[in-house]
Amino acid sequence: MNYLHNFKDTLFVDLLEVLNIVTIGEEHVNQLNLSGDASLSASSESSNMSFNSGSEENSQEKSVEDLEKQNCEINIHKNSDKEADTKKDPFLVTFNGEDDPLMPYNWSTNKKALIIIQTMLLTCVNYMGSSIYTPGQLEIQNEFHVGHVVGTLNLSLYVLGYGLGPIVFSPLTEISSIGRLPVYMITFFLFTMLQIGCALAPNFAGLVILRFITGVLCSPALSTGGATLGDIVSQNYLALVLGLWSIGAVAAPVLAPLLGASMVVAKDWRWIFWLLFFCCCATMLLLTFFFPETSSDTVLHRKAARIRKLTGDNRYYTEKEREEAQLPKKQFLIETLYRPFSMMITEPIVLAFDLYIALCYGAFYLFFEAFPIVFGGIYHFTLVEQGLAYFGFCVGCIFAYIILLVFSIKVAAKRFANNTFTPETTLILAMCIGWCIPLALFMFGWTAKVHWILPIISEVFFVLGCFNIFQASFSYLAICYPKYVASVFAGNGFARSSFAAAFPLFGQAMYNNLGTKNYPVAWGSSLVGFFTIGLWVIPFVLYKYGPSLRSMSKYNR
């Protein structure tokens, strides 16, 4: 019973409800009087869950006591602004005050921690899918007789897919009747099943198509994961939690090549996808039982739906349902699907950070082209040793998160305490740490032949900058556009994934054309480094002009 109470909006419990095995509610209705002031009195009952006996003998004789056993909770909305609106609406379903345990913000710490861990795990598994392929690329090229650029399509199209997916999926998660959970579970289930197709692909064209589709399907976890964390974590701690989530987002694609290399050495490239399939199955099992719906609008929608079902009265509604019902479906779809692009084009803040993050993300995936040149071509590392060379990024994640903690405690927390915190406070982190990215690119390029440890050290600096710029920008965007955070992240995901998909395609050609015998990756890395220096001015500009830009935004009202 305790499990059903704490995880009632999980996929497993949803199935139990659909099959009428359990009936779920919060508090029951004692008396409903729609005359006069439309008053409603409610009482509580010790049990919140009731199992159906399967018998329907007394189903035709429901009384008030029967309704009491259905455990419904109805909260009354009251507008005190005008005398005419003082009457209560018994059909408006809301949270039962700010301390309502049904509200995601008020869930227990243990429950929130479990959701955070599962969100990180889901993100890790999906991000692994991008780079776990790279150790097997040469084998795939040889088996299907394709060149390097064509072989790289399996990486690029996967990354492009999870940039395109959020344009459709992220707005859907903002619809109260859908929410986050169905989008997560349906897409991840299909993603898991298609790994079997990748492992058994008979030709290269089929593999490329499946990789693109799986990239699209994995996108909800990557783009909406931050919104899920924002559903349950207050703004005071959101930056820290997003930092933890981002560790998984960075660590997964850099650890995946080591796992992929192990599979290639032990078996062959097809076992890369079998390994990913098994990881997905384990994750899917955990999410089925312990990952609940987190969107507050959808939690209320589910509450209202249960009341409608148990009372047989379809007049119960939520404010969000009423808003969505009044908007024509065609217009609603246009707005939700068009909004990420609209905000990217019309909002200078969104556009600026989309460009900055896209370049950083593209530079990150450029390392997957540079590593074989440096560690394979210069130092003759084996396939597994090349996978180990990515550990510099993991070390960088640890130091980067420490910097984030220090900033949050020493700067952000103090400004929260004395009420001087503004969205621009988060930009201080990006302003102070942005120099690490160009330094890392220059260091990686010009010290590649000095000693193998120096390029690995440059990975640490790259993550120090990239990680904290991501945290600063995502926190800033989330605070500036709280109502449309999923759409903002969807547009950002499209921008950065487009860059990340393109960089591996021209990466090797760029290094070959710009490189010299003594400096094979120097000028190529430096070219990207110069662009990162130019975009480093963005947080400085927004720190000064951000408030005025936000005041003019129609999405910030």
Curated annotation (Swiss-Prot):
Compartment annotation: Cell membrane
Knockout consequences: Leads to increased sensitivity to benomyl, diamide, and menadione, but not 4-nitroquinoline-N-oxide, cycloheximide, or fluconazole. Increases the intracellular accumulation of 5-flucytosine and clotrimazole.
Residue ranges that the Swiss-Prot or TrEMBL entry lists as coiled coil: none
Protein purpose: Multidrug transporter that confers resistance to 5-flucytosine (5-FC) and clotrimazole. Also confers resistance to benomyl, but not 4-nitroquinoline-N-oxide, cycloheximide, or fluconazole. Plays direct roles in extrusion of 5-flucytosine and clotrimazole.
Positions glycosylated per UniProt: N33, N48, N106, N418
Regions crossing the membrane: 113-133, 149-169, 181-201, 204-224, 238-258, 271-291, 355-375, 387-407, 426-446, 450-470, 484-506, 521-541
Annotated protein name in UniProt: Multidrug transporter FLR1
